[in-house]
UniProtKB/Swiss-Prot annotation:
The protein's name: GTPase Der
BP terms from Gene Ontology: ribosome biogenesis
Pfam family, one: KH_dom-like
Domain EngA-type G: start-end pairs: 4-167, 175-350
Chain residues that bind GTP 1: 10-17, 57-61, 119-122
Function of the protein: GTPase that plays an essential role in the late steps of ribosome biogenesis.
Subunit structure: Associates with the 50S ribosomal subunit.
Superkingdom classification of source: Bacteria
GO molecular function: GTP binding; ribosome binding
Binding of GTP 2, residues: 181-188, 228-232, 293-296
InterPro entries, per the entry: G_ENGA, GTP-bd, GTPase_Der, KH_dom-like, KH_dom-like_a/b, P-loop_NTPase, Small_GTP-bd
Length: 435
């Protein structure tokens, strides 16, 4: 299901990251009283009154400065393009500035719902000052205090009221997957071979595919949507604005995918950039399949696949759950296995385990390995329940979450994998204090 997207934008140092953290109720964005701290967009899922949505935090928009400021503005412009609803955050202490007016004009041209929020309205006198912001022409300003939380509920009410009408429920039946990787590993060729036609421009130049292209297709009665992304370059090589857009669109494709195919090049082996690319998908919590393309090129023997697989497992230890598929876009070798493997991973990441079964597993796990002890205090595990899917997320109720050592968390994840088929999907464990 594609969730509504909400973007928080504004000039530097008005409290966007603090508002972002307040809405998602956790500190994900770096917050510092210094303009330009948030350079990249931060994504997180949020929920208000039963309405789930994707929230984007952006860096401060400015038309002054140098290359870094231009890149930050490009990031924000992409967020604006992706958003269904835009929150323009201003600061009552600064009053209305020329920069506020320029940003307001930019947002007005989008023809999208824009909600004007005035931050740092911490007392009645400051709340009276918000009337100056009517001059921006964006409707009624909403006074908020990101740091204290006042007015956030009113803001969220307004946000969900502006969400677009829900799309046809048939969209829920479509399995979305994207192919990611550094440039020139053959992603576009894989898409064309998979679809049986030239949908994406293919050339032997890096960066041929600038945009991410969504293409629906049906295989064995199952509906899929494949997103072929522009190759992700090493950060030091991202100079042109168009290349910056390519990286941003690839990130967006990952966010919009159920399953991500990490494409490696068998002819060049694993590069450092492959690890960065894999990290994007892993951190997003998406299902992952490792696809080794150009398997027709290197000289091989009977042990070549096993040797390459060992190298993959060594270099991508955090992706030990991801299946590996050796293919050739040129010859078509094993391309027909991609849809069924995507469907298998999708099913695995959406399965639910009954709480009674999970607690039987916990009991058996406690007999295998004792719970950790820190400073003379032992972790006590009471029960476990699954709270969400895609990725499978489990809450473990304990006496003190601080006692949940990462090694024991990993042990519980391994127990889940041994007892249930979670091939291709990450698993999240969330320790919570029993009330």
């Amino acid at each position: 299901m594609v969730l509504p997207v909400v973007a928080i934008v504004g000039q530097p140092n008005v409290g966007k990251s603090t508002l972002f953290n307040r809405i998602i109720n956790q500190r994900l964005a770096i917050v510092e009283d210094k303009p330009g701290v948030t350079r990249d967009r931060n994504y997180a899922q949020a929920e208000w009154m039963g309405h789930k949505f994707d929230l984007i935090d952006t860096g401060g928009i400015t038309w002054e400065g140098g290359k870094i400021e231009d890149e930050i503005r490009a990031q924000a412009e992409i967020a604006i393009e992706e958003a269904d609803v835009i929150v323009m955050l201003t600061n009552v202490v600064n009053h209305v500035t020329d920069l506020d007016e320029r940003i307001a004009r930019l947002l007005y041209r989008t023809k999208k719902p824009v909600i004007l929020a005035v931050n740092k309205a911490d007392n009645p006198e400051q709340r009276n000052d918000i009337y100056d912001f009517y001059s921006l022409g964006l409707g009624d300003p909403i006074p908020v205090s990101s740091s204290h939380g006042t007015g956030i509920g009113d803001l969220l009410d307004e946000i969900v009221n502006d969400f677009p009408a829900e799309k046809d429920s048939e969209a829920d039946d479509v399995i979305s997957f994207s192919m990611i990787g550094r440039p020139n590993v053959g992603k576009s060729s894989l898409v064309n071979k998979l679809l049986g036609e030239d949908r994406v421009i293919v050339a032997n130049e890096e960066g041929t595919t600038r945009d991410a292209v969504d293409t629906p297709f049906t295989k064995d009665g199952i509906k899929f949507k494949v997103v072929d992304t522009a190759g992700i370059r090493r950060r030091g090589k991202v100079y042109e604005k168009t290349e910056k857009y390519s990286v941003l669109r690839a990130m967006s494709a990952i966010e919009r995918s159920d399953v991500v195919l990490l494409v490696l090049d068998a002819s060049t082996g694993i590069r450092e950039q492959d690890k960065h690319v894999a990290g994007y998908a892993h951190e997003a919590g998406r299902g992952i399949i490792i696809v080794v393309n150009k398997w027709d090129l290197p000289e091989k023997n009977s042990t070549s696949a096993k040797e390459f697989e060992r190298e993959i497992r060594s270099e991508f230890q955090y992706l030990d759950y991801a299946p590996i598929l050796f293919v050739s876009a040129k010859t078509g070798q094993r391309i027909d296995q991609i849809p069924s493997m995507v469907k298998e991973v999708y099913d695995n990441q959406n399965q639910r385990i009954q709480s009674s079964v999970l607690n039987d597993l916990l009991l058996e796990a406690s007999k295998l390995v004792p719970t950790p002890m820190i400073k003379g205090k032992r972790l006590r595990v009471y029960y476990m329940t699954q709270v969400s899917t895609n990725p499978p997320t489990f809450v473990v109720f304990v006496n003190d979450p601080e006692l949940m050592h990462f090694s024991y968390e990993r042990f519980l994840i391994n127990q889940l994998r041994q007892n249930f088929d979670f091939t291709g999907t990450p698993i999240k464990i969330l320790p919570r204090k029993r009330k």
